[in-house]
Amino acid sequence: MSAAEMCAVAEQEPTATTHRPVLYGAALAALDVRPDGCYVDATYGRGGHARGILERLGPQGRLWVADRDPEALAHARETLADDPRCTVLGAELAELPRLLAEQGLAAGVDGLLADLGISSPQVDNPDRGFSFQRDGPLDMRMDPTTGESAAALLERLSARDIAGVLRQLGEERHAGRIARAIVAARDAGDPPRTTLALARLVEQAVPRREPGRHPATRTFQALRIAVNDELGQLDRFLEGVIDLLAPGGRLAVIAFHSLEDRRVKRFIRRASSVGDLPPSVPVPPAGCQPRLRPLGRDLRADEGEVAGNPRARSAVLRVAERLS
């Protein structure tokens, strides 16, 4: 199915009580779900894509869903408990290729979808600490039961290290100013421990606003990525994902910022090329054959979807198919 055909596929409406994921119709079209196929939703969230896959599967089809967020897992287990076609895994993205292979799925997956970033329920719950628009503890962990919160990270790092995080993971031009403001507040005995406290610090530190963007946007992105090791998780996931796919199996990844999308783009490019071979080797040896074929160009949300869901503006869907 071409990129144009993916975009043209009519999107099924989720029910009034469910949230439509970004690029819902395009992602499901990209997977080209067969009724008897085996599919993986690597980032369940609240199950929007999973429901769409299940609607297209027959009685012999199988769906594996995974997430590392305990609330998402509880939702999946409650919602999918009565469907014998489904298996729910609690797993970080990086662990998923190994866990699925242990379940006997190596070279057996017909389609795998990864919708990167945070889900709407995570953003909307102030207790999770992801949003600068709602006051709550400065947490930002995808799994609140493990690891270091954003507040703890900011209390531990030096100004130089905080600036490095903001610059590298948020592409923040004012990283130095913001880092110094955070450390000054910390030294004064008032470190940012809530989302609004951090947002106010950033607003005061940044000399001018970008039109249409809150000054704290890049800071919150950078801290979330750092707290959850999102880029490391993505890299390790991509390293093992091809071996899961059956020949002709599809990989579909939705990214929400350039740091993620560049990684996915480079991965597909490398896996779909044979590299630089000397002229004396006119036919690539077996070990150098391309393993993926990119399907069309990157896909983005149209104006109608962006109007209904502003988060869709930055989403990019890339699709590739395993060759052998």
Swiss-Prot record:
One of its GO terms (biological process) is rRNA base methylation. It catalyses: cytidine(1402) in 16S rRNA + S-adenosyl-L-methionine = N(4)-methylcytidine(1402) in 16S rRNA + S-adenosyl-L-homocysteine + H(+). Its main location: cytoplasm. It is an enzyme of class 2 (transferase). S-adenosyl-L-methionine binds at G47, G48, H49, D67, L96, D115, Q122. GO terms for molecular function: rRNA (cytosine-N4-)-methyltransferase activity. It comes from the Bacteria. It is found in: Cytoplasm. The keyword Methyltransferase applies. Its EC number is 2.1.1.199. Keywords: Cytoplasm, Methyltransferase, rRNA processing, S-adenosyl-L-methionine, Transferase. Gene3D superfamilies: Putative methyltransferase TM0872, insert domain, Vaccinia Virus protein VP39. The keyword Ion transport does not apply. GO terms for cellular component: cytoplasm. Belongs to the methyltransferase superfamily. RsmH family. Specifically methylates the N4 position of cytidine in position 1402 (C1402) of 16S rRNA. PANTHER family: 12S RRNA N4-METHYLCYTIDINE METHYLTRANSFERASE, S-ADENOSYL-METHYLTRANSFERASE MRAW. This is Ribosomal RNA small subunit methyltransferase H.
